[in-house]
Design a protein with these regions (language model features):
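Preference for bulky hydrophobic residues occupying beta-strand positions
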Residues: 6-8, 45
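Metal-dependent phosphoesterase core characteristic of DEDDh/y 3'-5' exonuclease domains
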Residues: 21-28, 32-63, 85-175
Length: 175
């Protein structure tokens, strides 16, 4: 069994074809961990923007990805193929903080490949939902009712190092 902690970055862009907005993936970020949650391997690739050619200001500030990065990135089909190959064929469980990453991956898969099932994702765990089951809810919830990652870490006094993927580093400590 493989454990994959996924941290996607995306840009919300208007799509004429959809006549609405889509969260277009601009970076695949993930790491594989063993049964003791030690990092085995990491994966990261910047994706060439095909829908939104310019990043929103908050996306640039949060991710430190530039418009030049997404114009020179790997096309989505190739990035997805690289990610799929990196994941491999072993049974797996994908983790993310909240369901935003998995929903965005599904929507991009539907948009670009016209398929609604991702064959290489066998199992999925929303680490935020899992943590909400045992961390006191009233002390940590934000206005939208979600459990903020950094607040969760502070409550359980986790030490973590900030890397290119803060969420991935934090999830490794939480799980």
């Amino acid at each position: 069994m493989q454990f994959i902690i996924m941290d996607l970055e995306w840009n919300n862009a208007y799509c004429k074809k959809l006549k609405g907005y889509i969260n277009e993936i601009i970076e695949f970020g993930a790491c594989k961990v063993d049964k003791d949650f030690n990092v085995i391997d990491e994966f990261s690739v910047i994706v060439k923007a095909q829908v939104g050619k310019k990043l929103q200001g908050r996306v640039k500030a949060l991710t430190h990805i530039t418009n030049e990065d997404i114009s020179n990135g790997v096309p989505f089909f190739k990035a997805l193929s690289m990610f799929r190959n990196w994941v491999g064929d072993d049974e797996n469980v994908f983790f993310s903080w909240g369901d935003g990453d998995i929903r965005t991956l599904i929507k991009n898969y539907e948009f670009f490949l016209k398929k609604n099932r991702i064959p290489f994702v066998n199992n999925y765990c929303d680490a935020q939902k899992y943590c909400q089951s045992f961390i006191p809810r009233l002390r940590l919830r934000n206005k939208s009712g979600f459990l903020p990652l950094l607040s969760s870490l502070e409550l359980i006094r986790m030490n973590f190092r900030i890397t290119g993927h803060l969420m991935t580093a934090c999830l490794l400590q939480l799980v």
